[in-house]
């Protein structure tokens, strides 16, 4: 599908697939409970796990982050460019719903450099949820055709290539820098 069609689907609180730095992600409007519920059902993902949020600029992630708990050094980590995509687990605002944070009082966020994410966020005006586009037990999709093979020929997928990263993002804690998932 073309960018404009994917943007319309996102604005209608539908789940779409889009390319990220290494693999295709499944995403939706994180402010829509119904959209997130559709995503969780599609992925067969327990709500307790929480979701990653991606955007091309920090402004779109700030509504989810408890800024009062972060120091300048944390902001530097969050906004720095890395060799591999890096998702940071940061304190969530109390207003962030549990369908985003899961069982945690934190939220996982990533500034994504992929042009597709930038265009989608710019045109929708919101960050996107991001979980790898794959059915349980199958590897994450690296092409639009793989997405269609797993989710059906008519699943809304943005026809663009993934970035050059080899692995999905590394996930780290902003305070301890503990690695939850290697990139």
UniProtKB/Swiss-Prot annotation:
Q: State where the protein is found.
A: Cytoplasm
This enzyme's EC code(s): 2.7.7.87
Extract one GO cellular component term from the record.
cytoplasm
Q: Tell me a GO biological process for this protein.
A: regulation of translational fidelity
Looking up InterPro entries in the UniProt record yields: DHBP_synth_RibB-like_a/b_dom, Sua5-like_dom, TC-AMP_synthase, TC-AMP_synthase_SUA5
Give the source's domain of life in one word. Answer: Bacteria
- The protein depicted here goes by the name Threonylcarbamoyl-AMP synthase
Q: Which reaction does it catalyse?
A: L-threonine + hydrogencarbonate + ATP = L-threonylcarbamoyladenylate + diphosphate + H2O
Q: Note one Pfam family from the annotation.
A: Sua5_yciO_yrdC
Task: Report if keyword Amino-acid biosynthesis is assigned.
Answer: no
The YrdC-like domain is annotated at 1-183
Family, similarity comment: Belongs to the SUA5 family. TsaC subfamily.
